[in-house]
Amino acid sequence: MRGVTRVLVSFMGLACLAATTAWAQHPQAREGFWIGFGFGYGSAKPSCDGCGTLDSRGGFTGFLKLGGTLSKQLLLGGEVNAWTKADSGVTDQLGNVSAAVYYYPAVSSGFFLKGGVGFSSFREMDGATADGTGVGFVAGLGYDVRVGGNISITPVGNFYFGSVGDIKVSGATNSTGWKQHVFDFGLGVTFH
């Protein structure tokens, strides 16, 4: 896990450094439709009624976002965040689908803060499928590093939370009070 995190952080740093010249040539402009996607690594921590202490686990993450521009500092869109881990024949998947607002405090900067609300889900597959859906939210930050007129490399940090509630296996309740949260770091591409 530490090796993957180091590689990802190093790659993000190099991408930002390599894009410095391109960034100076391509100023920040936010207009119209935008879409982005990326991948990363994150730590998930679940809890539930009667489960005792569940450990945090590292896994791969991904995101997809798209939307429209409301102003030079405010974007509105939808975002899907997912975390997955496969180990010993068991695959766990956690995710959020959110309506999100992206706020750029300085018009000339690529730095942004985001927040959103929506749905959260959990799924575990190990022969039988355990799953549940509830409410969730996402918060995060990032930086659009312009590498072309309409393209940015976008390092991000995300936190997403879900209050899933009941987890069911074949229609029968297996766990109650399920909650989950994920912290992740990723690197994406955004098309403006």
Question: Predicted regions span which residues?
Answer:
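Hydrophobic transmembrane alpha-helices
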Residues: 48-55
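Amphipathic alpha-helical interaction segments
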Residues: 19, 41-42, 167-168
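Gram-negative (and chloroplast) outer-membrane scaffold detector with strong preference
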Residues: 25-29, 33, 39-45, 60-161, ...
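Solvent-exposed loop segments that connect transmembrane elements
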Residues: 52, 167-176
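Mature extracytoplasmic/luminal segments of secretory-pathway proteins
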Residues: 13, 45-48
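Low-complexity, intrinsically disordered/propeptide-like segments
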Residues: 11-20, 66, 142, 176
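Cleavable N-terminal export/targeting peptides
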Residues: 1-29
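Outer-membrane beta-barrel and related beta-rich outer-membrane complex signature
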Residues: 49, 90, 127, 166-169
